[in-house]
UniProtKB/Swiss-Prot annotation:
Residues 987-1011, 1267-1283, 1295-1320, 1366-1379, 1390-1400, 1419-1428, 1491-1503, 1567-1586, 1702-1714 have a biased composition (Polar residues). The modification Phosphoserine is found at S4, S631, S635, S689, S1294, S1385, S1491. Belongs to the RFX family. The gene is Arid2. SUPFAM superfamilies: ARID-like, ARM repeat, Winged helix' DNA-binding domain. Keywords: Acetylation, Chromatin regulator, DNA-binding, Isopeptide bond, Metal-binding, Nucleus, Phosphoprotein, Transcription, Transcription regulation, Ubl conjugation, Zinc, Zinc-finger. The lineage of its organism: Eukaryota, Metazoa, Chordata, Craniata, Vertebrata. Highly expressed in testis, expressed in heart, liver and kidney. This is AT-rich interactive domain-containing protein 2. GO terms for biological process: cardiac muscle cell proliferation; chromatin remodeling; circulatory system development; coronary artery morphogenesis; embryonic organ development; heart morphogenesis; homeostatic process; negative regulation of cell migration. The keyword Transmembrane helix does not apply. Residues 13-105 form the ARID domain.
Length: 1828
């Protein structure tokens, strides 16, 4: 067929092919398929053309009828020779196209029977019998090709309804309304009005309410149909609506003016009232429509359309005002439902006016239903903000009054409805709140409802209420999240190690105020990141992930828990590339689980940040942002703020603002085991005092992780790995603050953040964990203002953490500040077994950078910059692998080479020690820490020597070598440092395991703490501290400098890890006041050249108990304890060969002194014999001494160094110096020494933490013996090895100042020693002779009067005699008052000389508290230590470091006799070994050696059982000590453990800023541990009174008759107890009360009313043994109930009090007042408490409080709802209404009680109380600003 269609051939061909395909498909479906196209005349037949032609002619039938086939043949151009062409076409059409035509053209049903029963196909059967509608449909293809519209109007069912309603046909309308009624019911197919909103209009039109607009149906429905249907809806509405205002809504415009008033009147008279009911046609139809609208109003999608339809609103208003009851109810219900979406028009609109009219009418009604609906409508209207202005203006006061009146009715529903509307109204702002407050008694009623119980409504009332629980996806937001303890999620569940579990427990310290739970999404993302990691080959069940998340949230009591949907969204966020697949689970009957592909569970979960802290504006917020790249390890999700594994109680510490001088440093703690820590805000409360060395030691801040930290906050961060056997290399980044040039404030010089990561493996001693207290270590030197040290303790199972030291760029050398990096594990414990097993255990040795690295780095670093920063040498990380030792726990430190501090930095310190500086102007200390070469050693040189040599002192080429390897020694880079100040970089030592005991970290911590303390303690101290590190060298150098040139260091035994352990162990906490880092001496001694001539103290740590001190083959040159500024060079009575005194130290407590010696050549080294030569310069408080003396060379043993003479190995020996020198150096306090000597036993004890208790404090009663005698490590041995008086911090105590105690001056060195740790150095001159050493002239003059006082940490130590004055007689609390700052360290009579000093030194160390160590110098212990006599070295102390306060627990170590003499070393912050009580006990006896014992403290448990040993009246000594200066920075807190009834309180020196509660926890734990190991000994008599140091007020020592001034406290202990009647078993232990009662509750009532009344409460708790902490009264009441008035606590207090009373009676007569020479004692500085401390205390106690009235029974849902809503209303009123606040003030007391209850509404009430105060203050501020 030629172009028959006129279409182009290609198009035609395409259509033809498409037709053929369709035709084939058609036949195939019918069972008559064809393959070949028929051919006619030799050509294929065009079936498409044939079909088209036939259908155009009318189809097969028409063509056949008209016989038109011949015509068609012609059109196909068949050859004429084909005679039968027409017939053939017809047959082919029949065969192929007829059926197709029949179905597709005519639309007939295909009635063809299935193939197999073919019907005879007759032409007649093809005649169509139906019409084919398909012929009219145009295919989309054609429609598109012809440009026709493709938008179809798809009719839906709603159109049918609309058309039915429009039709007006009665049946259709009824049908449509019935359908609408059914669809409106709640079901799967709720009517959706948006599909055709006209339905509403038509439904309303059928009820006689018409739209006002044109085109409404009023004419049709209202008029035309009324005639046809006899339905008059207008009349209906007029009949049932009586309110004339509402009748206007009835639309009857036409009839309105026709009717006259007369007709209405007649009609009302004669027309019967409408009979409403089922027979009322109009009424029923209106009711039907009202039901439909009400049902639709419950669907959110329909509410907006209904609320926006003004016709609907008119209908509802008419219904609400009708007297057709059912209709009115439906109308009000619907109005209430749509009110929330109803936007009111301006009030001049009729509908808006009528809305308020309706609400008012309902409220004033007498009908309960109407009242409730009226309040519901009003409350919902409040939800739209735009309605607020209208509501506030047009809801009158009468309505408010009516609403409030509902609250007084005993109707649950009415009360709840009323509260709901009041809450919504109060959200509107001050207008509504003021109107509510103006209603009489409204506030009173609401306050009553806050504590109302729904049961008061009676059982019937509640029965009528049906409770429907709606599961909420998120938790109630109304209740404030009460911060639970900030717990680290112990994700490391697989680590079942004790330490880890313990950590969790310990973590429950209440979070600081301002800590807020992080939002749910962030937490979920962190949790996912912490528990899972990307791994394309693994998959995890998604359901399991979510269930684990829910479990974690449940354990943490988190407020917001994500739904599964929200959780999976977080999953997609954290792991964007994961996929999901279904996995059949064969175990669960083939049920499929959804698995997340590409994610696997972490073997070691990361820490999670649960809270963030809103930093007070005042403090520089130190935000540690996670620095992901810090460590090779993935960034940790977040290191928890709180102590992690180590249950450390971190005190929130104010971070001082040192920002001015500091440059930001990065502190990164990359730890392998830890992923980069998510950034967290370090919780460092701002420290108000910046640059105030006095500031309390900042509590340790936990920095979540590496982030640049402003140097301003100097932090020593200790990351402690409490992981059994894991060595965690730590990265340390130390940022030296830029040198602070301020000359005046040395302490401020560059407080640098020091991050010390101490990785410490807890070797199977979870108990050590408690030690975390050391974590508080602050680097005193660093930040005068009291830099918090952050300690991050993480338990990592055997994972190695790589330590990296990051050089802190330009931060001043950390050391310069005298900051001590303390790598102190909070856990001091190392067991002897550990030592023994050290090889097997993770190596104790911390491997510092491999030696090769070390050497190069050191030189490079040192030379590289003048800044003394620890630099990571070459940034190399030493891998543990570097150490052959198998012990996995090795920690590798990168080489730390302190760089010389630029002179500018040093300047502050220099200024402080101008005198010294000249000598050591070039001094620069370089600490090189390198791995010992002998990696193979089990105890690979666990101890690295830290030699801080001032370049000046050392030969230029000499480097102090910390490395265990000798190679390192050569590094001369330090010499370049000389130009820098004497800043000594802090060396960090970490033993791999840190001896697996906390000790090394502890040491470091102690050091840092001491320093900080120094800074804090005395103004001079800051300089000293600064100097301590940097200047220390100066001071030390000054003192030692002459000798420094050759500070030879004996070689410590390289392998002796136990020595290292010992060294480390003693440092329980940041005990070293000046503590520099103590690096355990490497096995290889530094080259001799490194030695400076300065005296060296060699601590010999022997694993053995052997008392012998090996002189490490060191030159006689005395080693200084460089750690502290005041270096006491005490000539040893028996200088070890080589002239270096080696003090065997079981527990090298010396560490407390800045272990890093600042003296030019001082080197700590441990000989293979476990000897460690340590130069300790007491940094801590010695700054003061330095200041005062300028360069006094006093070696004051940092308290941390407790070497008890008794412990031969532990003894600290100071080489004899010329007398003059010794005098200078004598300032050191005696070490009270724990006998931490090398006894294995002790070591074991220490490891276990028992050592404190076990150590016995021996006081040599023979002063004479003392000299020659050294206490062996046991302290029992009265070996004279310690011949030289134990040096406090390397100074002998045997200076002349001591002589009185020494029957003869033990050592010729009668030169006065000023015991100064952190405090102005005071010389203890014999007989009060000014003991200024040559180098101590500056302070000494001031101190002259005070010479007798030993200043420790700025605290005067009592000289021997004076020390004795402090007697245990003083009640603990008194003691705490006296020693309150922990600054007084009575020094035992020097007669006890070296031994005593050693003991005291140890004690000092132990006792040293980060904030200020108290040096309790038990004269006796110090004396005894040197003596053979059973001198009780107070070795036990050495182990304890109390981060928060010095604990001088000279606990009996090995020494059999536990002498009470306890030295609280001013510096030592040694955390108290568990149970150790470090008591600063002045020895009651005169300094005389024998008397030294007088105050023996049996402080095993921290209880001071000290018997006061009456010392021979060594009153000269007393005279020498005019008084004990009070250190502002420290207070001694007596902590009693209510659980240990047998233990007396532990005295702890607490830094001023520290939270005593934290200290108390640590101390109690320590005491508990000790107690387990040893019977408690009581040292009650630690009552040295701290008097302001400057005035050097006399210290009262109770029990010392010689005391010139009676200690104020002493009286109380001496009071006769009130008469005790039968049955009275509980005594009030309030100061001077002692009344007996029958029950604990009576004691509590008595104490709360008699001692805690408004008029009598003194501002702090004076309970015996309680710290003098300023408390708000409510906080005190809570504290009293929790801590003192429980049955256990009272019994424990009685047990402690009994021995105390006896001791007090003995010593009361002996308590002389020390030193009238000092000016009147300055009032002890009030401990600065956090502004929210009271609230925190209430929070902590609230869990224990019992409010029987409303918490005995669990709150029911109704009760909870009423209380919570009432509380929210009160909160809003307090927030917005001034009038309301005035009225609320009356109820503040009641609300306060409720706010600390367990009610659901308690947190809301707390917010209400907050609004009462905060809003007033803010308004006052606004007024002030406006005035300005």
């Amino acid at each position: 067929m030629a172009n028959s269609t006129g279409k182009a051939p290609p198009d035609e061909r395409r259509k033809g092919l498409a037709f053929l395909d369709e035709l084939r498909q058609f036949h195939h479906s019918r069972g008559s398929p064809f393959k070949k196209i028929p051919a006619v005349g030799g050509k294929e037949l065009d079936l498409h053309g044939l079909y088209t032609r036939v259908t155009t002619l009318g189809g097969f039938a028409k063509v056949s009828e008209k016989n038109q086939w011949g015509e068609i043949v012609e059109e196909f151009n068949f050859p004429r020779s084909c005679s039968n062409a027409a017939f053939a076409l017809k047959q082919y059409y029949l065969r192929y196209l007829e059926k197709y035509e029949k179905v597709h053209h005519f639309g007939e049903d295909d009635d063809e029977v299935p193939p197999g029963n073919p019907k005879p196909q007759l032409p007649i059967g093809a005649i169509p019998s139906s019409y084919n509608y398909q012929q009219h449909s145009v295919s989309d293809y054609l429609r598109q090709s012809y440009g026709l519209s493709m938008d179809f109007n798809s009719p839906n069912d709603y159109n049918k309804l609309v058309l039915s309603l429009l039709s007006g046909l009665p049946n259709e309308v009824d049908f449509a309304i019935n359908v609408c009624t059914l669809l409106s019911n709640e079901s799967k197919h709720v009517m959706q009005l948006e599909k055709d909103p006209k339905i509403i209009t038509l439904l309303l039109a059928n009820a006689g309410v018409f739209d006002d607009t044109l085109g409404s149906f009023s004419s049709v429905f209202g008029e035309e149909w009324r005639e046809k249907t006899d339905r008059d809806f207008v009349k209906f509405w007029k009949d049932i609506v009586d309110d004339n205002e509402v009748r206007d809504l009835i639309s009857d415009r036409n009839k309105a003016h026709e009717d006259t008033p007369g007709e209405w009147i007649w009609e009302s008279l004669f027309h019967p009232p409408r009979k409403l009911g089922i027979n009322d046609i109009e009424g029923q139809r209106v009711l039907q429509i009202a039901v439909i609208l009400r049902n639709l109003s419950f669907e959110e999608s329909n509410v907006k359309l209904l609320a926006a339809n003004r016709t609907c609103l008119r209908f509802l208003l008419l219904s609400a005002h009708s007297h057709f009851i059912s209709l009115r109810q439906l109308g009000l219900d619907t109005l209430g439902n749509i009110a929330a979406e109803l936007l009111l028009d301006p009030v001049d609109f009729r509908t808006t006016h009528l809305m308020f009219h309706t609400v008012t009418k309902c409220l004033m009604s007498r009908d309960r239903f109407l009242k409730m609906r009226g309040m519901e409508i009003l409350g919902n209207l409040c939800k739209a903000e735009d309605n607020g202005v209208l509501i506030c203006e047009y809801v009158d006061q009468d309505s408010y009054r009516e609403i409030i009146c509902h609250l007084t009715l005993p109707d649950v529903l009415l009360v709840t409805s009323t509260l709901e509307v009041l809450y919504m109204l109060t959200e509107m702002g001050d207008v509504a709140c003021t109107k509510i407050a103006k209603v009489e008694k409204s506030i009173d009623v609401l306050v009553c409802l806050v504590s109302m119980d729904a049961q008061m409504f009676g059982p019937d009332a509640l029965a009528a209420v049906k409770l429907i629980e709606h599961p909420s996806s998120s938790h109630q937001v109304l209740s404030e999240i009460r911060p639970q303890a900030i717990e680290q999620v112990q994700t490391q569940t697989h680590i079942a190690s004790g330490p880890a579990s313990r950590a969790v427990v310990a973590q429950h310290a209440a979070p600081p105020p301002g800590i807020v739970e992080i939002d749910s999404e962030k937490f979920a993302c962190q949790w996912l990141n912490a528990h899972f990691e990307v791994n394309p080959d693994c998959s995890v069940s998604r359901a399991e992930m979510y269930s684990e998340y829910l479990s974690t949230c449940s354990k943490l009591a988190r407020g917001g828990i994500l739904t599964s949907t929200g959780f999976y969204k977080c999953l997609r966020t954290v792991f964007p590339n994961h996929t999901v697949k279904r996995v059949e689970d064969s175990t669960s009957s083939g049920q499929a689980h959804i698995h997340v592909i590409g994610v696997k569970r972490r073997a070691l979960p990361l820490p999670i940040q649960m809270y963030y802290q809103q930093q007070p504006i005042s403090t520089p917020v130190v935000r540690v942002d996670a620095v992901a790249d810090l460590s090779p390890t993935p960034s940790p999700a977040g290191i928890p703020h709180g102590p992690q594994a180590a249950g450390n109680h971190f005190q929130r510490t104010p971070v001082t603002n040192q920002s001015s001088n500091l440059t930001a440093t990065q502190m990164s703690f990359p730890v392998q085991g830890i992923h980069t820590v998510a950034q967290t805000v370090s919780r460092i409360p701002p420290n108000p005092s910046v640059h105030t060395h006095q500031q309390q030691n900042s509590p340790v801040t936990v920095i979540q992780n590496k982030a640049p930290i402003p140097c301003e906050v100097v932090k020593a961060t200790v990351i402690q790995n409490s992981v059994p056997q894991t060595a965690v290399p730590v990265s340390i980044s130390v940022g030296g603050a830029p040198a602070q040039n301020s000359v005046g404030q040395n302490h401020s010089a560059g407080p640098q953040p020091v991050t010390v990561v101490n990785s410490q493996t807890l070797l199977h001693h979870p108990s050590v964990m408690p030690q975390p207290s050391p974590l508080h270590t602050v680097v005193p030197g660093q930040v005068p203002s009291g830099t918090p040290v952050t300690v991050i303790q993480q338990t990592v199972p055997q994972s190695r953490m790589f330590g990296r030291v990051q050089s802190i760029p330009a931060c001043t050398s950390t050391v310069s500040q005298g900051q001590q990096l303390i790598t102190t594990s909070p856990q001091p414990m190392h067991t002897s077994s550990q030592q023994t097993a050290a090889g097997s255990q993770p190596q104790d040795t911390v491997i510092i950078a491999p030696p090769q690295y070390v050497t190069t780095s050191a030189s490079n670093i040192v030379s590289a910059t003048s800044v003394q920063n620890f630099q990571v040498a070459t940034g190399q990380v030493v891998t543990i692998a570097g150490v052959p030792s198998p012990q996995p726990s090795r920690v590798g430190f990168q080489n730390i080479a302190p760089k010389p501090l630029p002179s500018q930095q040093v300047s502050p310190s220099v200024v402080q020690q101008p005198i010294q500086q000249p000598q050591q102007p070039a001094q620069q200390s370089v600490v090189i820490v390198s791995q010992p070469a002998q990696q193979g050693q089990a105890y690979a040189p666990a101890i690295h020597q830290i030699v801080l040599a001032n370049p000046a002192a050392l030969p230029a080429g000499q480097t102090v070598q910390l490395t265990g390897q000798p190679n390192i020694t050569p590094s001369s880079s330090p010499s370049p440092v000389p130009p820098t100040n004497n800043q000594v970089p802090t060396a960090m030592s970490s033993s791999s395991t840190l001896q697996s005991q906390g000790p090394p970290p502890t040491v470091s911590q102690m050091l840092s703490v001491k320093r900080q303390q120094q800074q804090q303690h005395s103004p001079a101290a800051p300089a000293q501290q600064v100097q301590v590190q940097v200047q220390q060298p100066q001071q030390v150098q000054v003192q030692v400098q002459p000798q420094q040139p050759s500070a030879g260091v004996g070689q410590p035994a390289p392998n002796e890890s136990s020595l290292i352990k010992q060294l480390l162990l003693p440092k329980r906490g940041p005990s070293t006041p000046g503590g520099k880092l103590i690096l355990p001496a490497p096995q290889i001694p530094p080259p001799n050249n490194a030695r400076a001539p300065s005296p060296q103290v060699v601590y010999q740590v022997a694993n053995n108990q052997a008392a012998g001190f090996g002189v490490q083959g060191q030159t006689p040159a005395q080693q200084l304890l460089v750690g502290q500024q005041n270096v006491q060079l005490v000539q040893s009575a028996m200088p070890p060969a080589g002239g270096v005194q080696t003090v065997p130290i079981s527990n090298l407590q010396i560490l407390p002194g800045p272990l890093i010696s600042n003296s030019p050549a001082t080197i700590f080294q441990g000989t293979s014999g476990n000897q460690v030569t340590i130069t300790v310069v007491p940094n801590t408080s010695f700054a003061t001494a330095t200041v005062s003396q300028g360069n006094a060379a006093q070696l004051i043993a940092p308290a941390g160094l407790s070497m008890s003479g008794a412990q031969a190995s532990a003894g600290l020996q100071v080489q004899t110096l010329p007398a003059g020198q010794s005098a200078c150096t004598t300032a050191p306090l005696p070490f009270k020494g724990d006998k931490i000597i090398c006894q294995k036993e002790e070591e074991a004890k220490e490891a276990t933490g028992l050592h404190v208790h076990e150590r016995k404090i021996e006081v040599m009663e023979n002063p004479s013996c003392r000299r020659g005698t050294t206490n062996t490590s046991n302290g029992d041995t009265s070996e004279s090895e310690l011949q030289v008086g134990s040096l406090l911090n390397g100074r002998k105590y045997s200076d002349s100042s001591l002589p009185p105690s020494n029957s003869g001056k033990l050592q010729s060195e009668t030169s006065q020693c000023s015991l100064i740790s952190n405090g102005p150095s005071l010389e203890l001159g014999e007989n009060g002779a000014p003991g200024k050493q040559n180098s101590e002239p500056v302070d000494m003059q001031d101190v002259k009067g005070d010479l007798k006082k030993a200043l420790v940490n700025g605290i005067c130590d009592f000289d021997k005699g004076d020390g004795s004055h402090l007697s245990k007689n003083i009640p603990n609390h008194k003691t705490s008052n006296h020693v309150g700052n922990g600054e007084i360290s009575p020094v035992e009579p020097q007669g006890t000389s070296g031994a005593t000093q050693q003991d005291t030194a140890k004690g000092d160390q132990l006792e040293r508290v980060s904030n200020g160590p108290v040096l309790t110098l038990g004269g006796s212990p110090s004396t005894s230590s040197m003596q053979e006599a059973p001198s009780v070295a107070t070795p036990p102390l050495s182990g304890t470091d109390l981060p928060n306060g010095p604990l001088a627990s000279s606990l009996n170590s090995d020494v059999p006799q536990q002498r009470p003499s306890v030295v609280v070393s001013p510096h030592s912050t040694a955390p108290v070994i568990q149970g150790h009580q470090v008591i600063a006990v002045p020895h009651s006896g005169p300094r005389v050696t024998p008397s030294a014992l007088s105050s023996d403290a049996r402080s095993t448990n921290g209880t001071a059982e000290c018997k006061t040993v009456k010392r021979p009246a060594e009153d000269n000594d007393r005279d020498t000590v005019p008084g004990i200066p009070n250190k502002v920075g420290v207070r001694i807190v007596t902590i009693s453990d209510p659980n240990n009834a047998g233990c007396s309180a532990t005295m702890v020196a607490v830094p001023a800023g520290a939270d005593p509660s934290t200290v108390a926890k640590v101390a109690i734990e320590s005491a508990a541990q000790q107690k387990q190991q040893h019977p408690p000994t009581y040292m009650q008599s630690v009552a040295p009174q701290n008097t302001p140091m400057p005035p050097s007020p006399a210290v009262q020592v109770q029990g010392q008759p010689s005391s010139s001034q009676p200690s104020p406290v002493s009286a109380s202990s001496q009071h006769a107890d009130p008469v005790r009647k039968p049955g009275q078993n509980f005594m009030c232990l309030w100061q001077s009360c002692k009344k007996w009662f029958q029950t604990p509750s009576q004691v509590f009532y008595h104490a709360a009313t008699e001692h805690g009344g408004k008029d009598v409460y003194p501002g702090q708790c004076l309970w015996e043994g309680c710290e003098p902490f300023q408390r708000q009264r409510f906080s005190f009441i809570t504290h009293l109930q929790d801590k003192h008035c429980s049955k256990d606590a009272l019994l424990a207090g009685l047990k402690q009090d009994e021995p105390g009373q006896v001791a007090n009676q003995k010593s009361s007569t002996k308590q002389p007042t020390v030193g009238g020479t000092g000016s009147a004692p300055r009032a002890q500085k009030a401990i600065a408490s956090h502004p929210s401390a009271a609230l925190m205390a209430l929070r902590r106690g609230s869990r224990n409080l019992v409010f029987r009235d409303f918490t005995d029974e669990k709150e029911g849902p109704i009760t909870k709802h009423i209380r919570l809503t009432a509380a929210l209303i009160l909160k809003n009123i307090g927030k917005y209404s001034e009038c309301g606040r005035r009225l609320l003030k009356r109820h503040e007391n009641n609300l306060s009680v409720l706010a600390i209850s367990n009610m659901e509404a308690s947190s809301t009430l707390a917010k209400c109380l907050y609004e009462l105060n905060f809003t007033v203050q803010s308004k006052e501020q606004e007024k002030d600003s406006e005035m300005l």
